């Protein structure tokens, strides 16, 4: 795969192009699941890039591991994380308005809205008020990221949710930004693969 891509595969490359049997084997061996410990896997293969050394040796690796392993019975945490990602301009804190924008952008895409309530129609989804959306965002993903985010997600005055100050010095690093997006994209795709099985999300593609 590395030779065909012309670079080391990231998580999404592995998810997309890995043989199904190999992918399932990785999932069934949690301790050795490279999707849950990607940077450690890359380091072990001797493929860590120079610009990733700071990420690996510092708190950034622990943060990425939190994103890789956070519980996802629903996909609600992902639009919150994308609000922080902010199209590559990482925010240290997000407001309710910024969360709402990211939330609606995510759930307005395709049929993602169905994940809010499997019994809901599209018309009912469109009728949900911004106030109702914000209430759900704060009560569910924001709350649970604070509870299970190992201190990386905190409450800060003037914001709905913030990143720990420990991350401030690294959030502008190219490696941090690239891995942040890669993890979130992977978690979204993997979630929908599991949810729909052989439905609309198809994982396997061929290289070449």
List PLM regions with ranges.
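Intrinsically disordered, charged low-complexity linkers and terminal tails
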Residues: 1-208
């Amino acid at each position: 795969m590395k030779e065909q891509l012309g670079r080391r595969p990231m998580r999404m490359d592995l998810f997309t192009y890995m043989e199904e049997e190999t992918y399932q084997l990785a999932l069934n061996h949690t301790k050795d699941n490279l999707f849950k410990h990607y940077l450690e896997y890359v380091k072990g293969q001797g493929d860590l890039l120079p610009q990733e050394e700071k990420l690996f040796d510092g708190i950034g690796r622990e943060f990425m591991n939190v994103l890789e392993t956070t519980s996802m019975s629903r996909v609600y945490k992902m639009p919150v994380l994308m609000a922080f990602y902010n199209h590559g301009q990482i925010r240290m804190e997000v407001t309710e308005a910024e969360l709402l924008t990211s939330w609606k952008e995510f759930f307005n895409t395709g049929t993602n809205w169905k994940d809010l309530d499997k019994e809901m129609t599209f018309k009912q989804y469109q009728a949900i008020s911004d106030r109702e959306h914000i209430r759900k965002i704060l009560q569910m993903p924001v709350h649970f990221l604070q509870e299970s985010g190992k201190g990386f997600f905190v409450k800060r005055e003037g914001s709905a949710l913030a990143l720990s100050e420990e991350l401030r010095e690294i959030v502008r690093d190219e490696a941090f930004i690239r891995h942040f997006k890669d993890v979130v994209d992977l978690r979204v795709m993997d979630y929908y693969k599991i949810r729909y099985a052989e439905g609309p999300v198809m994982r396997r593609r061929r290289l070449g």
